[in-house]
Amino acid sequence: MTKILFVCHGNICRSTMAEFYMKHIVDKAGLSDSIYVESAATSHEEIGNDTHYGTKKKLDEMGIPYNCRKARQVTVDDYHNFDYLIIMDENNGRNLKRIIGDDVDSKVFKAMSFVGESRDVKDPWYTGNFDETYDDVSRSCDALLELIKEKI
């Protein structure tokens, strides 16, 4: 089983969008028994809160199913239990390192790296642009799934 953890600041916008999008495309590919997907935050600010309404609205618009969930903070155990920890931006990477330490197993990847880009996935909490975030998330998840399919 390949395990993917999407990580952003609060676990209510970008990482949850990525979690639900990835679950959707994994299911469509018939790989739900082979790929496990979850998400978490680097901060504690939104712990216990559900997915942001803007993320839900965009997922609804795109026909991506989601469920009620509670934001949670990433842990050291997550580093050991997941194969891929996908960060949305450089700040997530710095904050994740404070929690898990060094990435000795090379499991941490920037989301846009899967499409050959080094830039961040912009946070719609600040930009208000859930369309742009969805475009980045969907492109990076599609590419990540193709990479994983080659390995399983």
Residue map of PLM features:
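Phosphate-binding/catalytic loops
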Residues: Y84, E90-I152
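Helix N-cap/beta->alpha junction signal
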Residues: S15, D89-E90
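Hydrophobic structural packing positions in well-ordered secondary structure
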Residues: C8, L59, I86-I87, V137
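Conserved active-site segments centered on acidic
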Residues: M1-H80, E146-I152
